[in-house]
Amino acid sequence: VYYDLYVVLDIFSRFVVAFTVAASEDSLLAKELLEQAMGVHGIPDVVHADRGTSMTSKPVAQLLVDLGVTRSHSRPRVSNDNPYSESAFKTLKYAPAFPDTFGSLADARAFADRFFGYYNHEHRHCGIGLHTPASVHYGTATEIRAQRQATLDAAYTANPTRFRHRPPTPPKLPTIAW
């Protein structure tokens, strides 16, 4: 038995703004998930999606047109057209706790709840300066980066010979998604 995982991902912060697990692909469920995500996090300028039947459906297309959102879809038969989403799904599938099978739809949903809580609030992502998606999404990453810089400055001041050539700096924050 396979279940379908729907994920709405903010590609700038890598924050999963909404998700659900369903027994089958459903265009109305995809539309409802997008409405939920946009109701909480605002209406984006662009929604980039795969070419699955639910994301190319009339209900989803009409919702995006009504909201003035530009639709963008992956190229046909190009699996790596959305590296942000691909990275999130790889992190999910390679998580040590990812089971071989789910006993039920409820089990799959419970796993998704736990995983995306971890992913958003604990997982340090190299593409966003080793911050959590939540810290970038909610704007606390700049302060955290400043604290990291202060720690590195203190380490450099205490022992400059430990560092070659120049003082260390923390990884940079993203400035633009695409």
Positions of the model-derived regions?
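Charged DNA-binding/catalytic regions of mobile-element recombinases
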Residues: 1-178
